[in-house]
Amino acid sequence: MKQKYSKKSKKWIYITTIIFILILDISSKRLIIKYIKTYDTKKIFSVLNFFHVHNHGAAFSFLSDQNGWQKWFLSTVSMLTILVMTRIITKLKKQETKKITAYSLIIAGATGNLIDRIFYGFVVDFIDIHINDWHFATFNIADCSIFIGIIILMRINYST
């Protein structure tokens, strides 16, 4: 039996996903700013720290060593991403909920990091996963949202 999806359910998935991720992302960053000084670390588990750092670049601190132009460039890229992905969602069929969710996750992550760039001039990163002395790049909830959205899209595109 086919499920029925209304236009409202498509919007509901889209809006709820974005709002949930934004609340989680913004709240977590505010707590980090409030309770952990920049470059300080709080051990959470043996493989997880909260390490408060300001990223002036993109993923893996790409472009962070530039003289400030990257803030505007990355903000523009984020805005274009948000607009293009929103347009894609409006063109998707109502029953394409996995794609709608994936694009919504990417939009939410891009929006969360864009908000940081606008208000702080950098992105607040704090999730530090490590094994002994090896540390993965520090990231945040918005980055996780973007990553998960991309993985979902890749699975959809490579499984069909």
UniProtKB/Swiss-Prot annotation:
Subcellular location: Cell inner membrane
Active site location: D125, D143
Entry EC number(s): 3.4.23.36
Function, in words: This protein specifically catalyzes the removal of signal peptides from prolipoproteins.
Name of the molecule in the record: Lipoprotein signal peptidase
PROSITE patterns, A to Z: SPASE_II
Catalytic activity: Release of signal peptides from bacterial membrane prolipoproteins. Hydrolyzes -Xaa-Yaa-Zaa-|-(S,diacylglyceryl)Cys-, in which Xaa is hydrophobic (preferably Leu), and Yaa (Ala or Ser) and Zaa (Gly or Ala) have small, neutral side chains
Chief place where the protein resides: membrane
Keywords tagged on the record: Aspartyl protease, Cell inner membrane, Cell membrane, Hydrolase, Membrane, Protease, Transmembrane, Transmembrane helix
GO MF annotation: an example: aspartic-type endopeptidase activity
Pathway listed: Protein modification; lipoprotein biosynthesis (signal peptide cleavage)
Domain of life: Bacteria
Metal-binding recorded as keyword: no
Entry's family note: Belongs to the peptidase A8 family.
Gene Ontology biological process: proteolysis
Gene: lspA
Pfam families in alphabetical order: Peptidase_A8
GO cellular component, one term: plasma membrane
Bilayer-crossing regions: 13-33, 72-92, 104-124, 134-154
